[in-house]
A protein has these predicted regions:
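Small/polar-residue-rich segments within soluble enzyme cores
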Residues: 253
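Gram-negative outer-membrane beta-barrel transporters
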Residues: 164-170, 270-272, 291-333
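Membrane-spanning beta-strands of outer-membrane beta-barrel proteins
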Residues: 46-48, 73, 99-101, 152-154, ...
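Face-selective signature of the C-terminal outer-membrane beta-barrel domain
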Residues: 3-20, 42-187, 203, 262-265, ...
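Surface-exposed extracellular loop regions of Gram-negative outer-membrane beta-barrel proteins
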Residues: 74-76, 129-136, 202, 206-250, ...
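One-face residue pattern on beta-strands with alternating periodicity enriched for small/polar residues
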Residues: 158, 195-199
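Outer-membrane beta-barrel translocator domains and adjoining extracellular loop/strand segments
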Residues: 17, 23-32, 37-38, 68, ...
Length: 333
């Protein structure tokens, strides 16, 4: 981080990770459960990094921020039948992909008596390359073999107004966001992905607060879904009129703040999902397939699945302990 003067500063941050997985086929405990796990898990090798910079300009009570970043995920999944690599005939999956995202975000924070206004926009260009060879053993066995080079331009706008009472007893936040991209006509209109949201907080007594929130959120399906092709090179999910995933969410709970660096909360939540990708191969929503290992979404889908989730979440947060932040949570769904 570098401070040019009292009005201008620049911060640069980066990190990376490597995941080099191997299957323990020589374990002594070859129970039925372990045999099943070894039979379906592929060998996964991943490399990822993110590099970004934040420029801030302070003008009185207002703050202007410009954020640029680049991230990349290199992913390789390989699987042989019975984990026997002695013959290429045993190869059932060879998946190699690269996801690269270049992001630019501009934001202004305007401060007024009793409320703050955040407005901004973002522009992003993503590239997704994929080389897939996969044998699918369904009712009719088939081989999937294709190559994808997908470029995707994304854009968005957002605004949030935050009000805080003079005695700091009541806080309200009202915001709206809109996102779009050039993947298809179903996704390129900002108004089709309009996301309003509202959150309220009221201090009941002492350090105990009642919090509530409600909002609509949109999420882009995974790149594996966007970039899936048939063996003739056609983007099947684009032809299937793929859309953003929609989620309506509401939450209500209590929060205890014994100090400026400690928070404990209990919140009940309800989430409703629409336009979720549904597999056309086995009629199972992608959300029900699990994402622990392997490739998710590398298949033909339609945006027709619905769902819901509700439960209780307990959270504890400890801020700025020797420069560190600790968060512990338990969720019952």
């Amino acid at each position: 981080k570098h401070t040019f003067d009292r009005k201008n500063e620049l911060a640069i941050l980066g990190f990376g990770a490597i995941d080099d997985m191997k299957l323990n086929t020589g374990m002594e405990d070859m129970s039925e459960k372990n045999q099943y796990i070894l039979a379906y898990l592929p060998v996964v090798k991943q490399k990822t990094y993110t590099l970004g910079a934040v420029y801030k300009h302070y003008s009185g009570k207002n703050i202007y921020s410009l954020i640029v970043s680049r991230s990349q995920l290199n992913n390789k999944n390989i699987k042989y039948r019975d984990n026997d690599e002695s013959s290429e005939e045993n190869l059932t999956l060879n998946y190699r992909s690269d996801e690269i995202e270049n992001k630019l975000r501009s934001e202004n924070i305007f401060r007024f008596p009793f409320f703050r206004l955040n407005v901004g926009g973002n522009l992003e260009y993503a590239t997704y390359t994929n080389r897939t060879y996969q044998k699918q053993f369904t009712t009719i066995p088939r081989v999937i073999n294709y190559h994808t080079d997908l470029g995707l331009l994304k854009w968005g706008l957002y605004a949030t107004a935050i009000y805080e009472s003079d005695n700091e007893r009541f806080t309200a936040s009202l915001g709206v966001r809109a996102d779009a991209n050039d993947y298809s006509p179903e996704m390129n209109n900002l108004l089709d992905q309009l996301s309003p949201r509202l959150s309220l907080s009221y201090r009941l007594f002492g350090a105990v607060y009642l919090n509530g929130s409600i909002g609509r959120y949109y999420e882009l399906p995974p790149y594996t879904v966007l970039g899936f092709k048939d063996n003739q090179g056609n983007y099947l999910n684009k032809a299937n009129h793929l859309t953003y995933i929609r989620s309506d969410q509401a939450g209500l709970g209590l929060e205890y703040r014994p100090s400026s660096y400690l928070k404990f909360s209990a919140e009940g939540f309800y989430k409703k999902y629409d336009q979720y990708p549904m597999s056309l191969v086995d009629s199972i929503p992608l959300a029900s397939k699990g994402t622990d290992y392997g490739v998710l979404g590398n298949e033909a889908v339609s945006s027709t699945a619905t769902g819901r989730a509700y439960g209780l979440e307990l959270t504890g947060r400890w801020y700025n302990y020797k420069g560190l932040t600790f968060i512990a949570s338990y969720t019952y769904v």
